């Protein structure tokens, strides 16, 4: 990565633009509030990485979108940034690599990040055939991800074929990763027909149902009637349900997805059960 300037410079926030199409969400949540507080008290400790936008006096942010957002929220007018000379593909690779180490990454973020990096590598001349089982040189796969296998990378990229509404279900933990991969083989209209049934019946397809949908879609096409019939089948894990709106749990676990919130509630119930047992034992003495 060739630096246009060796040391960070101060750049007005109004001259900074987000990287076009970057896959990582910048959310106003508890983590952002903590970052804003840190920026207010300590400033931005790690400079942003930016690149000049041709024929303008503006810059495109490669790394540091969350820090920039926190700075704007904190009322800071200028931020330190390292200006580098990179083409879009090289910048995309740096952007992805600088974000994949984060503790909390949504499935959709990882999916589009892997896709962005694979496309950038392909533009640079590396083989990144993610549609077949033969990925080409092992080095290419390792360059896409150091933590996920080639097959897992392909499965994540499959998620980019999901319509936004179903992908949101995946991010919220309401549809598991493996069924979501199977659903990604449905065409757009089939996915919207499925979404309608999911919302109508307040349920999501199991892995078995998702596999059946994929098979029917590839063999003869999936109709709304078939989707309704399959979704009306009772799943073992849906025979008896107790639901609590996420809004009522957010104050206790603000950053949790649906699965993490469920685990929190179950652990809380177990602690309370033990408390009641201890209380009863004391009363019986």
Summary of predicted features, one role per range:
Residues 275-285:
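Short acidic DE-rich linear segments
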Residues 27-30, 34, 65-66, 91, ...:
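Charged, alpha-helix-enriched surfaces in structured cytosolic catalytic cores
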Residues 40-46, 124, 134, 191, ...:
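Glutamine-centric residue-chemistry signal
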């Amino acid at each position: 990565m060739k630096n246009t300037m060796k040391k960070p410079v101060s750049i007005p926030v109004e001259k900074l633009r987000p990287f076009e199409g970057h896959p990582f969400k910048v959310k106003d949540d508890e983590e952002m509030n903590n970052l804003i507080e840190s920026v207010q008290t300590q400033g931005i400790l790690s400079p942003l990485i930016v690149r000049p936008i041709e024929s303008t006096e503006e810059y495109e942010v490669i790394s540091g979108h969350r820090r920039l957002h926190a700075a704007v929220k904190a009322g800071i007018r200028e931020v330190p940034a390292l200006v580098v000379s990179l083409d879009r593909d090289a910048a995309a690779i740096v952007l992805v690599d600088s974000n994949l180490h984060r503790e909390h990454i949504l499935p959709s973020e990882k999916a589009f990040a892997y896709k962005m990096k694979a496309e950038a590598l392909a533009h640079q001349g590396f083989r990144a055939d993610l549609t077949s089982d033969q990925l080409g040189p092992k080095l290419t796969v390792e360059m896409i991800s150091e933590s996920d296998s080639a097959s897992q990378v392909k499965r994540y990229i499959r998620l980019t074929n999901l319509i936004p509404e179903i992908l949101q279900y995946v991010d919220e933990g309401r549809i598991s990763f493996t069924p979501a991969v199977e659903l990604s083989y449905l065409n757009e209209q089939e996915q919207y027909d499925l979404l309608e049934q999911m919302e109508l019946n307040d349920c999501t397809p199991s892995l078995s149902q998702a596999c059946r949908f994929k098979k029917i879609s590839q063999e003869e096409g999936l109709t709304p009637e078939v989707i309704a019939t399959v979704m009306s089948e009772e799943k073992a894990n849906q025979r008896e349900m107790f639901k609590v709106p996420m809004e009522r749990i957010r104050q206790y676990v603000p950053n949790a997805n649906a699965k993490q919130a469920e685990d929190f509630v179950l652990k809380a119930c177990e602690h309370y059960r033990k408390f009641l047992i201890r209380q009863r034992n004391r009363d019986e003495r």
